[in-house]
């Protein structure tokens, strides 16, 4: 049996401020730092270890992974970073307060932008200061590859390309893998692994910094999955609450 651990980054400063974040490189809040330490402690107490780790090129996911591995005394584990594991790009919504955006465009429209799988928010323009094509972390991207906005289908496409080329082969070789990423990135992976319908993924929420374990067969098909707490596996349908750590 193969085990894969997925973890969404701890609470970010813009999660705290209820802003659309996307590819904006926002750091963890103090609460997010605590959540990451707690996740590491949970994994350590439950006897987990890792051979290789994957994350995005955004600091909230990178720092969460660093803290988790530090808490587990696994700081030496190789870490691979890729923009393909970045959060969904929210286009011109990035940086905007979600409640204020709902007041401007209507709650129904904002809900469609956030939760539908194939509707993109308004795009950035290339002269927008939030357009980060020239950021050195994206130097390998061609101009047409850098998104100006994304729907979940767009996010899923790049995430699964990286899954099939980089992560799945490591799992099949017997490596113990952890992925520290973002809400919509993990939603994309869960949709693929569990073969969820479009309706099924709309209601799927991924909590911050709670380890989600997938037990997979030799073909990487899910046997079962569950969240972890200090007391071990959490019953299906339940999500453990964070403790102060």
Curated annotation (Swiss-Prot):
UniProt site (Transition state stabilizer): 182
Annotated substrate binding sites: 8-15, 21-22, 60, 87-90, 98, 114-115, 183-184
Catalytically driven reaction(s): (2R)-2-phosphoglycerate = (2R)-3-phosphoglycerate
Entry-linked CDD domains: HP_PGM_like
Isomerase found in the keyword field: yes
Pathway as given in its UniProt record: Carbohydrate degradation; glycolysis; pyruvate from D-glyceraldehyde 3-phosphate: step 3/5
UniProt-listed GO biological process terms: gluconeogenesis; glycolytic process
EC number(s) reported in the record: 5.4.2.11
UniProt cross-references to InterPro entries, sorted A to Z: His_Pase_superF_clade-1 (IPR013078), His_PPase_superfam (IPR029033), PG/BPGM_mutase_AS (IPR001345), Phosphogly_mut1 (IPR005952)
One matching Pfam family: His_Phos_1
Gene Ontology MF: a single term: phosphoglycerate mutase activity
Entry annotation: catalytic residues: 9, 87
Disulfide bonds: none
Entry keywords, A to Z: Gluconeogenesis, Glycolysis, Isomerase
Top-level taxon of the source organism: Bacteria
Presence of keyword Isomerase: yes
HAMAP family in the record: PGAM_GpmA (MF_01039)
Role this protein plays: Catalyzes the interconversion of 2-phosphoglycerate and 3-phosphoglycerate.
Similarity comment: family membership: Belongs to the phosphoglycerate mutase family. BPG-dependent PGAM subfamily.
Protein name (Swiss-Prot/TrEMBL): 2,3-bisphosphoglycerate-dependent phosphoglycerate mutase
Gene that encodes the chain: gpmA
């Amino acid at each position: 049996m193969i085990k894969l651990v997925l973890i969404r980054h701890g609470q970010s400063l813009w999660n705290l401020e209820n802003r659309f974040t996307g590819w904006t490189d926002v750091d963890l809040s103090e609460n997010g730092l605590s959540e990451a330490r707690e996740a590491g402690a949970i994994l350590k107490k439950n006897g987990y270890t890792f051979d290789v780790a994957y994350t995005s090129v955004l600091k909230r996911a990178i720092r969460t992974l660093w803290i988790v591995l530090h808490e587990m005394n696994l700081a030496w584990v190789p870490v691979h970073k890729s923009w393909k594991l970045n959060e969904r790009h929210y286009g011109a919504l990035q940086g905007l307060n979600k409640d204020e955006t709902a007041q401007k465009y209507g709650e129904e429209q904002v809900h469609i932008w956030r939760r539908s799988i194939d509707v993109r928010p308004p795009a950035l323009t290339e002269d927008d200061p939030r357009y980060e094509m020239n950021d050195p972390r994206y130097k390998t991207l061609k101009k047409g590859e850098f998104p100006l906005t994304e729907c979940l289908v767009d996010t899923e496409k790049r995430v699964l390309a990286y899954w099939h080329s980089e992560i799945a082969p490591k799992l099949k070789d017997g490596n113990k893998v952890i992925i520290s990423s973002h809400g919509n990135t993990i939603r994309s992976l869960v949709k693929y692994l569990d073969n969820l319908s479009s309706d099924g993924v709309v209601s799927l929420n991924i909590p911050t910094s709670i380890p989600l374990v997938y037990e997979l067969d030799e073909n990487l098909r899910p046997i079962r999955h569950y969240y972890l707490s200090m007391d071990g596996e959490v019953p299906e349908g339940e999500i453990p609450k964070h403790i102060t750590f």
